[in-house]
A protein has these predicted regions:
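Basic, helix-initiating cap at the start of DNA-binding domains
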Residues: 1-48, 63
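Amphipathic alpha-helical linker/stalk segments
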Residues: 28-32, 37-38, 66-94
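Hydrophobic alpha-helical connector segments
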Residues: 42, 46, 77-104, 123-126
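Short hydrophobic/aromatic patch on the recognition helix
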Residues: 48-58
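DNA major-groove recognition helix of helix-turn-helix
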Residues: 58, 68-69, 179
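Amphipathic alpha-helical segments used for helix-helix packing
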Residues: 68-69, 97-124, 131, 162-163
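Amphipathic alpha-helical packing segments from all-alpha helical-bundle domains
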Residues: 90-93, 97, 115-150, 156, ...
């Protein structure tokens, strides 16, 4: 009889749980100190794993930061599948609220000045989500499509909320309303 491959093996499930603990430990440590000053030993200790276990899952700090960036994206985008510009404008509210709950992680993963240390592994997933939401507007072959995608990419980024928070004191809901208005206005104008 063939083995059931639709479910992860116990080993795969344990690996996923361990990796999640390690990533969550790093996220918690980022709330306490600058990410570049966090040692792998501190992450292992916080996660309750040995250093060899940590290195088996994440051989380098760069690998660990890439996993953190993926975790940040999955956390703020979980369950979102906007199918229109209106859906996208509404989804921004959720993205910004969730980002507020992990502000220091968002700041680090999106604002780090050295992309070699903090890779951006979710760019294609974000662009695909935007293309789906913008539908016909994103399917044109003129320059409008690229301008619209680039602008909406920025408006839907948690960095937009952080910028508005830092410079204008906006809460996530107010920033989302601003971004949502701009998305709907731009998408309407691009038709």
């Amino acid at each position: 009889m063939a083995a059931d491959t639709s479910r992860p093996s116990l080993r795969q499930a344990q690996r996923a749980v361990t990796e999640q603990r390690i990533i969550e430990a790093l996220a918690a440590l980022i709330d306490q100190e600058h990410p570049l000053e966090i040692s792998m030993a501190a992450v292992a200790k916080r996660a309750g794993v040995s250093e060899p276990t940590l290195y088996r899952h994440f051989p380098t700090k760069r690998d660990l930061f890439a996993a953190l960036a993926g975790y940040q994206f999955r956390t703020v985008a979980a369950g979102l599948a906007p199918a229109s510009a209106d859906d996208l404008a509404a989804a921004v509210h959720t993205v910004f609220q969730r980002s507020a709950g992990m502000e220091n992680v968002v700041r680090w993963t999106l604002a780090a000045t050295d992309p070699e240390r903090v890779p951006r592994p979710n760019v294609q997933a974000r662009l695909a989500m935007l293309r789906t939401a913008l539908g016909d507007q994103a399917g044109r072959d003129d320059g409008t499509t690229q301008f619209l995608l680039r602008t909406v990419l920025l408006l839907t980024s948690p960095m937009a909320w952080l910028y508005w928070k830092d410079y204008l004191g906006l809460e996530p809901a107010d920033a989302a309303a601003t971004a949502g208005w701009a998305i709907k206005t731009l998408a309407g104008a691009a038709r």
